[in-house]
């Protein structure tokens, strides 16, 4: 007999943190939002600034109760990598039913759930080979961290991902940010005679402002 998987009534989620702030990067910079940071990731970038392995389990009802204490109606589901979270669909269905605008921040190796209103994908150049076999096809914005010479990777992501906005972000390691080299690479991308998209700079303005 085939086993039927039934979702629990109050599923548990790996929660790193939930907090209200302003979106600090990309097209929606400045947008008031509640960030729901989920634990665990299917990549392990050396420069990642998120402790996605330190999390606690939290039930769906408690998550919803926490969200209702905030004024913002925009929810940013981030990580870690949200698309590997068990019972993600149930969480998203519940939030949509409550009338929230749902944004997803993902590395783009898995498809975005249909409940999402805005997809910001950040493919990782240090895992370029993985994107040859699995890659999201559409997004609202693409944000790539310039953790080296990423020109060829950016061109490949242009071909693989149809998006409205394309951003290159500086990489911060050991307190230093390679902003000059990031701007230089943006200039090269935008000066190509056959350039089909326009790349822009995205920086983590929330860090400069001293907010979460």
UniProtKB/Swiss-Prot annotation:
Keyword Iron-sulfur: yes
GO molecular function: 4 iron, 4 sulfur cluster binding; carbon-nitrogen lyase activity; magnesium ion binding; S-adenosyl-L-methionine binding
UniProt: Mg(2+) binding residues: 50
Keyword S-adenosyl-L-methionine attached: yes
Cross-referenced InterPro entries: 7-CO-7-deazaguanine_synth-like, Aldolase_TIM, rSAM
The organism's place on the tree of life at top rank: Bacteria
Pathways per UniProt: Purine metabolism; 7-cyano-7-deazaguanine biosynthesis
Cofactor binding note: Binds 1 [4Fe-4S] cluster. The cluster is coordinated with 3 cysteines and an exchangeable S-adenosyl-L-methionine.
Record field: catalytic activity: 6-carboxy-5,6,7,8-tetrahydropterin + H(+) = 7-carboxy-7-deazaguanine + NH4(+)
Record-given protein name: 7-carboxy-7-deazaguanine synthase
Organism encoding this protein: Neisseria meningitidis serogroup B (strain ATCC BAA-335 / MC58)
């Amino acid at each position: 007999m085939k086993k039927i998987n039934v979702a629990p009534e109050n599923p548990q989620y790996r929660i790193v943190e939930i907090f209200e702030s302003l979106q600090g990067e990309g097209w929606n910079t400045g947008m008031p939002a509640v960030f729901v940071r989920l634990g665990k990731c299917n990549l392990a970038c050396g420069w990642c600034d998120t402790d996605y392995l330190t999390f606690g389990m939290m039930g769906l009802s408690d998550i919803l109760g926490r969200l209702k204490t905030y004024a913002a109606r925009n929810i940013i589901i981030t990580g870690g990598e949200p698309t590997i979270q068990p019972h993600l669909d149930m969480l998203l269905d519940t939030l949509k039913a409550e009338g929230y605008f749902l944004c997803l921040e993902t590395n783009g190796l898995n498809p975005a759930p249909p409940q999402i209103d805005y997809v910001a994908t950040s493919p990782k150049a240090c895992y370029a080979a993985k994107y040859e076999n699995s890659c999201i096809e559409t997004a609202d914005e693409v944000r790539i961290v310039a953790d080296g010479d990423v020109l060829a990777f950016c061109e490949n992501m242009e071909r693989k991902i149809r998006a409205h906005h394309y951003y290159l972000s500086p990489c911060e390691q050991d307190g230093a940010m390679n902003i000059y080299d990031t701007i230089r690479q943006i200039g090269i991308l935008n000066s190509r005679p056959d350039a089909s998209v326009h790349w822009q700079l995205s920086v983590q303005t929330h860090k400069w402002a001293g907010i979460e």
